[in-house]
Amino acid sequence: KNMITGAAQMDGAILVVSGADGPMPQTKEHILLAKQVGVPSIVVFLNKADQVDDEELLELVELEVRETLNEYEFPGDDIPITSGSALLALEALTENPDTNRTGDPWVKKIYDLMNEVDNYIPLPTRDTDKPFLMAIENVVSITGRGTVTTGRVERGADQVGDNIEIVGLKETRQATITGLEMFQKTLEKSVAGDNVGVLLRGIQKEEVEPGMVLAKPGSITPHKQFEAQVYILKK
């Protein structure tokens, strides 16, 4: 459930596979889910490379990963694959936070991975000119501040002071945005693609729930019937 919710928002993904063990059953599940929910691009990180003494074994794991990606209709032959050790890179950075790509070979591998992400996964086009819309994924109550809804802005933009509508499941409600936060940073404005927490004035936690949306007033209306294409996943 959490994997599907997260993957549905992704513009790209890093598939982490143990270089010592190769693809596991859950690896295939994650690749299938990524394909079904429309993750457009994947890069691969073969972790635990420090535990593999024979370079040929690592090459066999890479070949197996590419074949698995091809099986689920990703371009496995073209997807960049980087090997390294997240643990050893973390230990090097913990010991010396100023370590850069030239200071430690395992840290360099992480830099190499992120370069592949930058080069292979294209920057997405955002619908910033359309009316604001955000699907609510979670709702929390902060003592002394009010109710915060979290989610990814699907289109448009919003800012502190904007009036919005809460639409779906219950009667449509009006609310005012009194705060925006993203990764523990306070914002004045958020735009399409941002994962944000939206603080709402005068709304109780029990009045909103996941599945509802925040929208520009008058831009959308709720419906009780719809047509859908459903994917049934089985083991």
From Swiss-Prot:
One BP term from GO:
mitochondrial translational elongation
**Gene3D superfamilies (UniProt xref):** P-loop containing nucleotide triphosphate hydrolases, Translation factors
Q: Which reaction does it catalyse?
A: GTP + H2O = GDP + phosphate + H(+)
Question: What GO CC annotations are associated with the protein?
Answer: chloroplast; mitochondrion
> EC number(s) in its UniProt entry?
3.6.5.3
One GO molecular function term of this record is: GTP binding
EC class of the enzyme, as a word: hydrolase
Its biological purpose is as follows:
GTP hydrolase that promotes the GTP-dependent binding of aminoacyl-tRNA to the A-site of ribosomes during protein biosynthesis.
Residues binding GTP are: N47, K48, A49, D50
Entry protein name: Elongation factor Tu, chloroplastic
* InterPro entries referenced in this protein's UniProt entry, alphabetically: EF-Tu_GTPase (IPR050055), EFTu-like_2 (IPR004161), EFTU_2 (IPR033720), P-loop_NTPase (IPR027417), T_Tr_GTP-bd_dom (IPR000795), Transl_B-barrel_sf (IPR009000)
Predominant localisation class:
plastid
| Domain tr-type G, residue spans | 1-125
**Keywords of the record:** Chloroplast, Elongation factor, GTP-binding, Hydrolase, Nucleotide-binding, Plastid, Protein biosynthesis
- PANTHER family per UniProt: ELONGATION FACTOR TU, CHLOROPLASTIC, ELONGATION FACTOR TU-RELATED
Protein family: Belongs to the TRAFAC class translation factor GTPase superfamily. Classic translation factor GTPase family. EF-Tu/EF-1A subfamily.
* Superkingdom of origin: Eukaryota
Q: Where in the cell is it found?
A: Plastid, Chloroplast
